[in-house]
Swiss-Prot record:
Residues 424-458, 483-615 are annotated as: Disordered. Homooligomer. Homomultimerizes to form the nucleocapsid. Binds to viral genomic RNA. Interacts with VP35 and VP30 to form the nucleocapsid. Also interacts with VP24 and VP40. This is Nucleoprotein. This protein can be divided into a hydrophobic N-terminal half, and a hydrophilic and highly acidic C-terminal half. The coiled coil region is critical for homooligomerization, for the interaction with VP35 and for NP function in RNA synthesis. A motif (PTAP/PSAP motif) lies at residues 603-606. Residues 494-505, 537-552 have a biased composition (Polar residues). One of its GO terms (molecular function) is RNA binding. Residues 438-447 have a biased composition (Basic and acidic residues). It comes from Lake Victoria marburgvirus (strain Ozolin-75) (MARV). The keyword Phosphoprotein applies. Encapsidates the genome, protecting it from nucleases. The encapsidated genomic RNA is termed the nucleocapsid and serves as template for transcription and replication. During replication, encapsidation by NP is coupled to RNA synthesis and all replicative products are resistant to nucleases.
């Protein structure tokens, strides 16, 4: 026995087994009415249970074979499904006019029968069957990515078809609740996916508008979820007149081993024939042997080479340890391209002038392609950032989905109990600028982390916009590790990272959610969306009166610095745009915290309370300071006897009057208040503190 064959044991079936599944088909003399009622039941959110596959297959047989069971039984579709373990059980009831009449009278169908009794169906058009099947096909291209991506893609296609005047779908079909129902059905129904794909590929005549939509959707579904197959075949296993040659970058021995394993996996995939490009959608056997993680170096090199050729396939992550390999492959491929172009130009050009013209053209072409690639990637990055923000803002989306589903469902489906959605804490290896994903995160896209804004990305770096995992956000996001360590003895509070909301109840809920506290303890400060009073604008009197409030929980640390490049004119929302903030970025906060001390009515001014008004001596380094019993903000006495309100005075978009006066008077070369105000936003919080404490 070859000992090395041990490595391959268990990768191939030795006793193949196919699980038998029974599918019920319905046969009546009023097939169109039955099919329309099946569509109505699905649209109403009724769970057909084990009758769902049979109902969907009944729709397909009616649409493609006009309910001719003999034609269907001799078709390639029926043969493939039988080989896959499906057995067809036909229920005949010639006089039945309602879907209710053909359902077997068995106890476990009782809830379904009760639900269908309340369903009123007035539609009896045959074209509605094709309309429904074409609508289902719109979800195929992004089916393996996730619900949001699939629904967005379907809506874009609906818009295109409506503009072209091909077909118009009912408005209630385009609601989020209904589209999620269809997505779930398509995700779970192998028969519907298979029939749509088979007919989309093989239907060559008799097309109507619905069939053309199905064919178009199936064409877009090719190699969905098989990006590594497409990139390796196009860029690594290069097909030439003399045969298949390996790309120069993968000719080293270790990568060659991965290429050999990949070829073996491809040969297994090819056994599925015309269904191989749809293997991920149909979940065919052998698909698990084509994951990126099984071929890390090959995958990284293939994606780097593809990007160098102008491909915008940037949504795929490679392992963090192989990210540099991807960048190196990109750079090497760009140089190889230039070298090949130079050699071709030398052979083609007849004189020096023509050679210069051709070289200049190819150089411009390369630059244009590169800039266009970066532009597309920038759009993808912004879209991903918006998507992540939407996930955070709609953290109870499941409850909203249930409500929207109830709008299209009948009264018997109304369920007043809300759905609880918890925030999953994930292992944190690095700071991220996105809020934590919710439980129903998009399967493939939610792993592709993004920075909070593409404005922090170096556009000269071709991978700055590619790498969903690898962005270094040191300028825009930072865990309070180095700077906050200077505040010795100040306990880190999970409350400091909580979102601020208009509802006090939501504040309490977020501050008491242990999972979210655990996650946010290590994450950067998420942006504040509402123009509301923050935890830090609460006056000290209120904090003393309510020692158990979440305001006191949130003031264990001084608030993170808040300053922008623009002067603040009024207390409306404005973004916090400094990228040098050691505490991380924070969003909009009520303007009261930025008011100077001279305003006696400012809520942030300390009340007439001895505990809050006592002068507290601070050393410039804050090394021995502990504030376990104190409330923020506080009066601080500097070295030279001046007082200012810490940290409020250091958070303003312009310097407080006391510091301006001191700096103008005491500097050897006095600066004007206007000049100081212009420089103030660019100073870090540490620099502001140092200036203030030495005045």
């Amino acid at each position: 026995m070859d000992l090395h064959s041990l490595l391959e044991l268990g990768t191939k079936p030795t006793a193949p087994h196919v699980r038998n599944k029974k599918v019920i088909l319905f046969d009546t003399n009023h097939q169109v009415s039955i099919c329309n009622q099946i569509i109505d039941a699905i649209n109403s959110g009724i769970d057909l249970g084990d009758l769902l596959e049979g109902g969907l297959l009944t729709l397909c047989v009616e649409h493609y074979y006009n309910s001719d069971k003999d034609k269907f039984n001799t078709s390639p579709i029926a043969k493939y499904l039988r080989d896959a373990g499906y057995e067809f059980d036909v229920i005949k009831n010639a006089d039945a006019t309602r879907f209710l009449d053909v359902i077997p009278n068995e106890p476990h169908y009782s809830p379904l029968i009760l639900a269908l009794k309340t369903l009123e169906s007035t539609e009896s058009q045959r074209g509605r069957i094709g309309l429904f099947l074409s609508f289902c096909s719109l979800f195929l291209p992004k089916l393996v990515v996730g619900d949001r991506a699939s629904i967005e893609k379907a809506l874009r296609q609906v818009t295109v078809h409506q503009e072209q005047g091909i077909v118009t779908y009912p408005n209630h079909w385009l609601t989020t609740g209904h589209m999620k129902v269809i997505f779930g059905i398509l995700r779970s129904s192998f028969i519907l996916k298979f029939v749509l794909i088979h007919q989309g590929v093989n239907l060559v005549t008799g097309h109507d508008a619905y069939d053309s939509i199905i064919s178009n959707s199936v064409g877009q579904t090719r190699f969905s979820g098989l990006l590594i197959v497409k990139t390796v075949l196009e860029f690594i296993l290069q097909k030439t007149d003399s045969g298949v040659t390996l790309h120069p970058l993968v000719r080293t021995s270790k990568v060659k081993n991965e290429v050999a394993s990949f070829k073996q996996a491809l040969s297994n995939l090819a056994r599925h024939g015309e269904y191989a490009p749809f293997a991920r959608v149909l979940n065919l056997s052998g698909i698990n042997n084509l994951e990126h993680g099984l071929y890390p170096q090959l995958s990284a090199i293939a994606l780097g080479v593809a990007t160098a050729h102008g491909s915008t396939l940037a949504g795929v992550n490679v392992g963090e340890q192989y990210q540099q390999l991807r960048e190196a492959a990109h750079d090497a491929e760009v140089k190889l391209q230039r070298r090949h172009e130079h050699q071709e130009i030398q052979a083609i050009a007849e004189d020096d002038e023509e050679r210069k013209i051709l070289e200049q053209f190819h150089l411009q072409k390369t630059e244009i392609t590169h800039s266009q690639t970066l532009a597309v990637l920038s759009q993808k990055r912004e879209k991903l950032a918006r998507l992540a923000a939407e996930i955070e803002n709609n953290i109870v989306e499941d409850q909203g989905f249930k409500q929207s589903q109830n709008r299209v469902s009948q009264s018997f489906l109304n369920d007043p109990t809300p759905v609880e959605v918890t925030v999953q804490a994930r292992p944190v290896n690095r700071p991220t600028a996105l809020p934590p994903p919710v439980d129903d995160k998009i399967e493939h896209e939610s792993t592709e982390d993004s920075s909070s804004s593409s404005s922090f990305v170096d556009l000269n770096d071709p991978f700055a916009l590619l790498n969903e995992d690898e962005d270094t956000l040191d300028d825009s996001v930072m865990i309070p590790s180095t700077t906050s360590r200077e505040f010795q003895g100040i306990p880190e509070s999970p409350g400091q990272s909580q979102d601020l909301d208009n509802s006090q109840g939501k504040q309490e809920d977020e501050s008491t959610n242990p999972i979210k506290k655990q996650f946010l303890r290590y994450q950067e400060l998420p942006p504040v969306q509402e123009d509301d009073e923050s935890e830090y604008t609460t006056d000290s009197q209120e904090s003393i009166d309510q020692p158990g409030s979440d305001n006191e929980q949130g003031v264990d640390l001084p608030p993170p610095p808040l300053y922008t490049q623009e002067k603040r004119q009024d207390p409306i929302q404005h973004p916090a745009a400094s990228s040098q903030d050691p505490f991380g970025s924070i969003g909009d906060v009520n303007g009261d915290i930025l008011e100077p001390i001279r305003s006696p009515s400012s809520p942030s001014a300390p009340q007439e309370d001895t505990r809050a008004r006592e002068a507290y001596e601070l050393s410039p380094d804050f090394t021995n300071y502990e504030d376990n019993q104190q409330n923020w903000p506080q009066r601080v006495v500097t070295k030279k006897g001046r007082t200012f309100l810490y940290p409020n005075d250091l958070l303003q978009t312009s310097p407080p009057e006391s510091l301006v006066t001191a700096l103008v008077e005491e500097y050897q070369n006095p600066v004007s208040a206007k000049e100081l105000q212009a420089d103030w936003p660019d100073m870090s919080f540490d620099e502001r503190r140092h200036v203030a404490m030495n005045l």
